[in-house]
UniProtKB/Swiss-Prot annotation:
Disruption phenotype: Cells accumulate extracellular fumarate. It catalyses: (S)-malate = fumarate + H2O. One of its GO terms (molecular function) is fumarate hydratase activity. GO terms for cellular component: cytosol; mitochondrial matrix; mitochondrion; nucleus. PROSITE patterns: FUMARATE_LYASES (PS00163). Substrate binds at residues 124-126, 154-157, 164-166, 212, 344, 349-351. Residues 1-24 form a transit peptide. GO terms for biological process: DNA damage response; double-strand break repair; fumarate metabolic process; malate metabolic process; tricarboxylic acid cycle. PANTHER family: ASPARTATEAMMONIA/ARGININOSUCCINATE/ADENYLOSUCCINATE LYASE (PTHR11444), FUMARATE HYDRATASE, MITOCHONDRIAL (PTHR11444:SF1). This is Fumarate hydratase, mitochondrial.
């Protein structure tokens, strides 16, 4: 039994309570909103609404926090809004400058630790919009020498002026996705394409057997095979780049339902121009704000482009993986870089790990696309309320493909070597070289040559001579793999 000595239980509890209150007062401050007072960590810039969301939506923990590119996009948006509101006479220049400075810090990532909210919150993203408003508000107050929480710079009246969560969140969705695609994804895909193109040129002289249906087919060069991969990546780049066009249309200025209530005429055009200036990308106001709030077809389209790209990258990684299979009992036409041990039980085994990592990324992107597609269909009346999960999955896809493209290029593609002896061995064994005889002896006779060779385990030449369909000289003149690489 717990016993208290030299003091009563009541006195002990009372003194402990006072101690805890003193500790709480030193590490927390009190913020207020329409629901009343709430304690907020003293070292954080966020306010009451962020704190309530933080307490009410403990789903997934830190790993499900709102993506930082979106947070940084909020900084761009809030700075742009302050500039435009000031220019239209709606915001005091002194307050505007403080908001701009604070928003710059958000955009640069300096205040990342002050954005704790997770993706799984209200479907409009209201709480993350208020997180940005509150952080910028309190940081601006601090810049002006005021007391944090005093609302000298108000999160709603000033930081959210001429705005609604319903138009700010879709706007930062587009800004974040566009910046990540333009500055991260496309450059890395271009690097991968260039690496594959270099291999295509390096391997252009190597004639190998083609395969269709996983069966032997007619010859091509290894360079031609790789040229197909180059084109797939180039097509993927073009598809993703095309999605930037629809992402360039911004919902900002639509406010609550698309009517533009509480904005001044021209606000929507001016803020798109200012965001363009801040980011270096071309943005424009959406021609129809009702569509921009209620539907996110541009996000679905962009995800679709990424999904197609994932299909392409899966095929490329899988082909290279198969062509590198072996080393003694597989195709082994390619020799892949050996980066790390491959087995905990089989000594000396090395696996195509980069290919496997890339294909797993592709599967994840396909899954993300499924989530985005369903969420994109869920715009009821004037608002889609699946915004956070849509942008979280889209940014995840962009990040994964960007990183995987780099890893696959550096640790696999650039180090691929052709196993020319093995390639030549398989080429000369192929029965499908018989296709060169079609124009000379006809399809039926050529088919008999191939089947006879396969049945008896002899070469095509031996089979053709045995069947008497041509002479040795004719065979040597007509069946030349190097002459079977294009129209003739």
């Amino acid at each position: 039994m717990l016993r208290f000595t030299n003091c009563s239980c009541k006195t002990f509890v009372k003194s402990s309570y006072k101690l805890n209150i003193r500790r709480m007062n030193s590490s927390f401050r009190t913020e207020t909103d329409a629901f009343g007072e709430i304690h907020v960590p003293a070292d954080k810039y966020w306010g009451a609404q962020t704190q309530r969301s933080f307490q009410n939506f403990k789903i997934g923990g830190a790993r499900e926090r709102m993506p930082l590119p979106l947070v940084h996009a909020f900084g761009v948006l809030k700075k742009s809004a302050a500039i435009v509101n000031e220019s239209l006479g709606g915001l005091d220049p002194k307050i505007s400058k403080a908001i701009q400075q604070a928003a710059d810090e958000v955009a640069s990532g300096k205040l990342d630790d002050h954005f704790p909210l997770v993706v799984f919150q209200t479907g409009s993203g209201t709480q993350s919009n208020m997180n940005a408003n509150e952080v910028i508000s309190n940081r601006a107050i601090e810049i002006l020498g005021g007391k944090i929480g005093s609302k000298q710079v108000h999160p709603n009246n000033h930081c959210n002026q001429s705005q609604s969560s319903n138009d700010t969140f879709p706007t930062v969705m587009h800004i974040a996705a566009s910046l990540q695609i333009q500055n991260e994804l496309i450059p890395e895909l271009t690097n991968l394409k260039n690496a594959l193109e270099a291999k295509s040129k390096e391997f252009d002289h190597i004639v190998k057997i083609g395969r269709t249906h996983l069966q032997d087919a007619t010859p091509l060069t290894l360079g031609q095979e790789f040229s197909g991969y180059v084109q797939q990546v180039e097509n993927g780049i073009q598809r993703v780049a095309h999605s930037l066009k629809t992402l360039s249309f911004l919902a900002q200025g639509g406010t609550a339902v698309g009517t533009g209530l509480n904005t001044k005429p021209g606000f929507d055009v001016k803020i798109a121009e200012q965001i363009s200036k801040e980011t270096g990308l071309k943005f424009q106001t959406a021609p129809n704000k009702f569509e921009a709030l209620a539907a996110h077809d541009a996000i679905v389209e962009c995800s679709g482009a990424l999904n197609t790209l994932a299909c392409s990258l899966f095929k490329i990684a899988q082909d290279i993986r198969y062509l590198g299979s072996g080393p003694r009992c597989g195709y082994h036409e390619l020799m892949l870089p050996e980066n790390e041990p491959g087995s905990s039980i089989m000594p000396g085994k090395v696996n195509p790990t980069q290919n496997e990592a890339l294909t797993q990324v592709c599967v994840q992107v396909m899954g993300n696309n499924a989530a985005i597609t369903f969420a994109g269909s869920q715009g009821q009346f004037e608002l889609n309320v699946f915004k956070p999960v849509m942008i979280a999955n889209l940014l995840n896809s962009i990040r994964l493909i960007t990183d995987a493209a780099y890893s696959f290029r550096v640790h696999c593609v650039e180090g691929i070597k052709a196993n020319e002896p093995r390639i030549h061995e398989l080429l000369t064994k192929s029965l499908m070289l018989v296709t060169a005889l079609n124009p000379k002896i006809g399809y039926d006779a050529a088919s008999k040559v191939a089947k006879n060779a396969h049945k008896k385990g002899i070469t095509l030449k031996e089979s053709a001579l045995e069947l008497g369909v041509l002479t040795e000289k004719e065979f040597d003149e007509w069946v030349v793999p190097e002459h079977m690489l294009g129209p003739k």
